[in-house]
């Protein structure tokens, strides 16, 4: 399924990253790119941006370019607003287009379940609905960050809001069903990015296995993945 959605031409972000490095450095070296997708596509999880970030880091090493972190961040910002964050990881507040980052302490790793309904919402179409007004703006990012710093990810989840839920839920009942499936069971849940993936906060990994069984028993055809948060120290 994912392979059908991957583009292999010049519009692929991994190849765009290579071209951007060549343009910036004047390096004429080439590279054979083997792209193994593990992050679901069109899921609001930044998979394409992560590909670009990995390419920037890899090319800097393999071509021995010795680009500084600042140079990599600047190149990354030209590729996408998420790329600078994905070059560094951790926990950060994004301003501007999301490329201006202020880092804060990461909470301890927590287990998560990612649930992706079969709802297609192109990012551009989702952003096209935004009119600058949102209930989410009333949620203070300072409160969320404070909970993060106190290692209280549950309170951070419940204090957070995603504007795209307001914009997309009225026209996509499956998104509402998906979120309520988890919140009705007491799990803090929020849609990530422009959707449609739901991020479900767990207490222990066995809960994820139980939820996957319940999803199947309820007849929902959702992709679900078990993962956990990470800190900058966890990155290679």
List PLM regions with ranges.
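Short hydrophobic/aromatic beta-strand micro-patches
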Residues: 199-201
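Conserved, helical-rich catalytic subdomain that frames metal- and/or nucleotide-binding sites
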Residues: 88, 93-188, 203-216, 220, ...
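Short pre-catalytic strand/loop immediately N-terminal to key active-site residues, enriched for Gly-Thr
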Residues: 31-44, 186-189
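DPxDG-like acidic metal-binding loop motif
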Residues: 43-69, 85
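N-terminal beta-alpha supersecondary unit
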Residues: 1-29, 40, 228-235
